[in-house]
Swiss-Prot record:
Known partners and oligomeric status: Homotetramer.
Keyword annotations of the record: Amino-acid biosynthesis, Branched-chain amino acid biosynthesis, Isoleucine biosynthesis, Lyase, Pyridoxal phosphate
Family designation: Belongs to the serine/threonine dehydratase family.
Gene name for this UniProt entry: ilvA
Species in which this protein is naturally found: Lactococcus lactis subsp. lactis (strain IL1403) (Streptococcus lactis)
SUPFAM superfamilies given in the database record: ACT-like, Tryptophan synthase beta subunit-like PLP-dependent enzymes
Cofactor(s), names only, from the UniProt record: pyridoxal 5'-phosphate
Pfam families per record: PALP (PF00291), Thr_dehydrat_C (PF00585)
Catalyzed reactions per annotation: L-threonine = 2-oxobutanoate + NH4(+)
Biological pathway: Amino-acid biosynthesis; L-isoleucine biosynthesis; 2-oxobutanoate from L-threonine: step 1/1
Stored InterPro entries: ACT-like_dom_sf, IlvA, Ser/Thr_Dehydratase, Ser/Thr_deHydtase_PyrdxlP-BS, TD_ACT-like, TrpB-like_PALP, TrpB-like_PALP_sf
Protein name per the record: L-threonine dehydratase biosynthetic IlvA
Top-level taxon in the UniProt lineage: Bacteria
Domain annotation ACT-like: ranges: 333-407
EC number, UniProt record: 4.3.1.19
Length: 416
């Protein structure tokens, strides 16, 4: 098991390499939740993610002979950037396996940080599939595998986030009540828990997962790590089907509260962080802040830290993020509605169905002359979520056979 001393030893090496990211009180969030909300901005790290800490420390602990062979890793993006940065700085080669679904922004950043030292292999639809391929390649070629989370040196490196948090809080005269920490494979929360429970046991560590990838919750329920059959890859930085054995053992009797955050709430938080605070956070990075909403009554008057774990957000995803946020807020809805095949049907729909401030965001219709009615896909944006019930009443009067796509997961996922 990792001790606080091991985290401190890791920091002795890393402090000359990593950025000591700020711990800042945020007035907007503090006012919103009637608490003192501090943000630990690892999105301002050199690779815009905390992952540099564990990757660099793990590689630095290899022998000269091991490093001369080159290293191998698997990552959904941020760990890969940390490994690439370390490989470049330490002048070694790195073969990096990434899922085919990895955002282009993260792939290009890996190339930028690693330069000629890295070779990227895109394999598998998920991190877990890439990891299997990477481990096989590592064994076949006798190259050290740098695990993204289930490695003691990686965990110790990630734990230096906690060391900085408590040192910064002490300097500001703050006694911390709770720290909200993202969970993917569990490396960050394992390192933070190992350090904080030994040095600052009065501070509660709260684990936060994306609702579509609750692998640590599943491990808690089963009493050991298990593999989820399906995960939502939206929060790609924490979309892991199986948590680490070591990370699970480090936190399962110490972290008492795990929260699962809806991907729509994460999307809403990403937009809020950008528009209100000027912070660019990736989905995984925003998850800790999003979780505040789930226990807002419990945190009133408390000193709270949320870790912005990463800021590697692909700008091309913003449309999807906005869409998910609008759906979560109850403002955007999709229906299949049967339209009479006669002139003026759309005009009637607009005048009779839409409210004065509502809008049609999608309309797909194929006219069939041999039928009296034809199905139409309609997307509607409400000005106020409370108008939903009256909208449904009006749609039912227009077509009592309409279909609300919110209950159809396959079609809804295709649209959103």
């Amino acid at each position: 098991m990792i001790s606080a001393k091991e985290v401190e030893d890791a920091y002795d090496l890393l402090k000359a390499v990593v950025t000591k990211t700020p711990l800042q009180l945020d007035p907007y969030l503090s006012n919103k939740y009637q608490a003192n909300i501090y943000l630990k901005e690892e999105n301002l790290q050199k690779v815009r993610s905390f992952k540099l800490r564990g990757a660099y420390y793990s590689i630095s602990k290899l022998s000269d002979e091991q490093r001369s062979k080159g290293v191998v890793c698997a990552s959904a993006g941020n760990h890969a950037q940390g490994v690439a940065f370390a490989a470049n700085q330490l002048n070694i080669s790195a073969t990096i396996f990434m899922p085919v679904t990895t955002p282009n922004q993260k792939i290009s950043q890996v190339k930028f940080f690693g330069e000629s030292h890295v070779t990227i292999r895109l394999i598998g639809d998920t991190f877990d599939e890439s990891a299997r391929a990477a481990k096989a390649f590592s064994q076949d070629n006798d190259k050290p595998f740098i695990d993204p989370f289930d490695d003691e040196n990686v965990i110790a490196g990630q734990g230096t986030v906690a060391l900085e948090i408590f040192a910064q809080a002490k300097k500001q005269g703050i006694s911390l009540d709770k720290i909200f920490v993202q969970i993917g494979g569990g490396g960050l929360i394992a390192g933070i828990t190992a350090y904080s429970k030994e040095r600052y046991p009065q501070t509660e560590i709260i684990g936060v997962e994306a609702k579509g990838a609750t692998s640590m919750k599943a491990a808690y329920s089963a009493g050991q790590p298990v593999t989820l059959e399906h995960i939502d890859k939206f929060a790609d930085g924490i979309a892991v089907a199986t948590v680490g054995q070591k990370t699970y053992q480090l936190i399962n009797d110490k972290v008492k509260q795990l929260l699962a955050v809806d991907e729509g709430l994460i999307s809403q938080t990403i937009l809020e962080l950008y528009s209100k605070l000027g912070i660019v956070a990736e989905p995984a990075g925003a998850t800790s802040v999003a979780a505040l909403e789930l226990i807002k009554d419990e945190i009133k008057g408390k000193n709270i830290v949320c870790i912005i774990s990463g800021g590697n957000n692909d700008i091309s995803r913003m449309q999807e993020i906005e869409e998910r946020a609008l759906v979560y807020e109850g403002l955007k809805h999709y229906f299949v509605i049967n339209f009479p095949q006669r002139p003026g049907a759309l005009r009637t729909f607009v005048s009779d169905i839409l409210g004065p401030n509502d809008d049609i965001t999608r309309f797909e219709y194929i006219k069939r002359a041999d039928k009296g009615k034809g199905p139409c896909l309609v997307g509607i944006l409400l000005s106020d979520a409370s108008d939903y019930d009256s909208l449904i009443d009006r749609i039912e009067r227009f077509d009592n056979r309409y279909v609300n796509l919110h209950g159809n997961d396959s079609l809804y996922e295709l649209l959103v």
